[in-house]
Amino acid sequence: MPEKLQVAIVGSGNISTDLLYKLQRSEYLEPRWMIGIDPESEGLARARKLGLETSHEGVDWLLAQDDKPDLVFEATSAYVHRAAAPRYEEAGIRAIDLTPAAVGPAVIPPANLREHLDAPNVNMITCGGQATIPIVYAVTRAVTEQGGTVPYAEIVASVSSSSAGPGTRANIDEFTKTTSKGVQTIGGAARGKAIIILNPADPPMIMRDTIFCAIPEDADRDAIAQSIRDVVAEVQTYVPGYRLLNDPQFDDPSINSGGQAVVTTFVEVEGAGDYLPPYAGNLDIMTAAAAKVGEEIAKESLSLAGGAQA
């Protein structure tokens, strides 16, 4: 077993290129291939300069090679990944899906990564999901420990219009559906809603998110606030630019909140600037979270194979 898992990146756009720079720093992942469909792609050109094997002939080319990757990161679009996913599985290649296709279980690193380290295909949900579902999870965790529930959570993700390429715009419907589902199934809210705003401001604004969670009126607010701070610190281990804008705000039940107590959390995400500009935190958190998931999968796989310590 090699000391690193051999990795292919499928897709050659902005997200794939930023992901490549992050994977190059990994102790457990070795990016060897980048696959696209545009021979003039800047992503493929950059990958070639960095020594990767590249092709503009898509997944067909990759799967025709004698030497195949252990792990694929796919950053194309939902419909493309839905078609490719069964082919990866048939070839014995594990996949980390950065599209909203949701073929495999959805993963938010602070919430449920350990549960899915052996899954053949995992989904990174959406940029808004990676930024906001950890907060919903933090609130639900604290409330559940007190014997309560979170009946409703709503997230609003505001991202720079400049950071939203054609893939993001084409996937808006999938974004809202996939993120809303994740707010419930991973965040733990009984009902969830997701809204994305493309901010046209110039100069571009960094990603900012608002998370509303309904909570029991008698919930321990200090415990909820501490749970939120703990999860933010965990996200910061792989997204250093992830931060609270201020302390969580608690409001008593009112007509405006449907008669429920509410905690509101404001976060912003500044990108690391590996390839994408720092204001594109919405894209950076996707690539950083995907790299985190890939590293943990690799640690587990290499440890089980005796190739490295977990």
Swiss-Prot record:
Catalyzed chemical reaction(s): acetaldehyde + NAD(+) + CoA = acetyl-CoA + NADH + H(+)
GO terms of biological process kind: catabolic process
Kinase in keyword set: no
Binding site for NAD(+): S12, G13, N14, I15, S163, A164, G165, P166, G167, T168, R169, A170, N171, N282
Keywords assigned by UniProt, alphabetized: Aromatic hydrocarbons catabolism, NAD, Oxidoreductase
Pfam families: AcetDehyd-dimer
Residues annotated as catalytic: C127
Enzyme class at the top of the EC tree: oxidoreductase
EC number(s) reported in the record: 1.2.1.10
Domain of life: Bacteria
GO molecular function: acetaldehyde dehydrogenase (acetylating) activity; NAD binding
Similarity field: Belongs to the acetaldehyde dehydrogenase family.
Protein name (record): Acetaldehyde dehydrogenase 2
